[in-house]
UniProtKB/Swiss-Prot annotation:
Cofactors: K(+)
Alphabetical list of InterPro entries matching this protein: YjeF_N_dom, YjeF_N_dom_sf, YJEFN_prot_NAXE-like
Residue positions binding (6S)-NADPHX: N64, N65, G66, G67, D68, G130, F131, S132, F133, S134, G135, E136, D159
Catalysis: reaction(s): (6R)-NADHX = (6S)-NADHX; (6R)-NADPHX = (6S)-NADPHX
One Gene Ontology CC term in the entry: mitochondrion
Family per record: Belongs to the NnrE/AIBP family.
SUPFAM superfamilies, per database record: YjeF N-terminal domain-like
Gene Ontology MF terms in the entry: metal ion binding; NAD(P)HX epimerase activity; nucleotide binding
Domain of life: Eukaryota
EC number from the UniProt entry: 5.1.99.6
Keywords on record: Cytoplasm, Isomerase, Metal-binding, Mitochondrion, NAD, NADP, Nucleotide-binding, Potassium
Gene3D superfamilies according to UniProt: YjeF N-terminal domain
Name of the protein in question: NAD(P)H-hydrate epimerase
Length: 239
């Protein structure tokens, strides 16, 4: 685990960075989602080696966070895991349709029964809401987040534990008030919520140019070997 402090990236700055990556950075949304999902899959591999259980339940929301989950599930399948997808509010966007088709071609199952699937898994990926989340948790996700909050199954949250405010952390009431998953992977850079997080913290962002990192005052940690993720201490987030 690295010990250097890392700066955090607000929701507004994260959105601006994404737009810049897709303009002056010349990345496509497909590339960014592929890199994010690959990072998520590697974090799962570090947290849940195959000999600890192969069944992975990936809970996907309707936006980019859910897309990251779909990509991660595809990589996990090729690593030898047995992913199951919970994707109740599917986007009609062509990118997400292709990501679903790729999983269907691999015979990866989709389920509408989250409580049932949760009883038959070894690990959960929370890819429901990401850095753009705000407001109330809408159906069908309140009960899903409550189930994640109470389960003893290990959970990896993608960019943010679902229902959390990117700036302020867990909500004061309602679904997710007590949601503290064992692990979190921050994508590109940690968000301010990390100051409230108490579990293991990974960073996936091994694609930023030094110039863009400097522009957004971000630190690029040292990644080992072929790794797309690095574990960082949660107390490293600076505001």
């Amino acid at each position: 685990m690295i010990k250097i402090p890392l700066n955090t990236l607000s929701a507004k700055s994260a959105a601006a960075l994404d737009q810049e990556l897709m303009s002056s950075g010349a990345f496509s949304i497909d590339q960014l989602m592929e890199l994010a999902g690959l990072s998520v899959s590697q974090a799962v591999f570090k947290l849940q080696p195959l000999n600890k259980g192969k069944r992975i339940l990936v809970a996907c929301g309707p936006g980019n966070n859910g897309g990251d989950g779909l990509v991660a599930a595809r990589h996990l399948f090729h690593y030898g895991y047995q992913p199951t997808i919970y994707y109740p509010k599917q986007s009609k966007n062509e990118l997400y349709q292709r990501l679903r088709k790729q999983l269907e071609d691999l015979k990866v199952p989709f389920t509408e029964d989250f409580p049932g699937a949760l009883k038959q898994t070894d690990h959960v990926v929370d890819a429901i809401f990401g850095f753009s989340f705000s407001g109330e948790v809408r159906e069908p996700f309140p009960k899903v987040i409550e189930a994640l909050e109470s389960t003893s199954i290990p959970v990896l949250a993608v960019d943010a534990p679902s229902s959390w405010s990117i700036e302020d952390g867990p909500p004061e009431s309602g679904p997710g008030k007590g949601f503290m998953p064992p692990a979190l992977i921050s994508l590109t850079a940690p968000k301010p919520l990390v100051k409230h997080f108490k579990g293991r913290h990974f960073l996936g962002g091994r694609f930023l140019s030094p110039e863009m990192a400097e522009q957004y005052n971000l630190d690029i940690p040292k990644y080992e070997g072929l790794d797309q993720v690095v574990e960082v201490p949660v107390e490293s987030g600076k505001l």
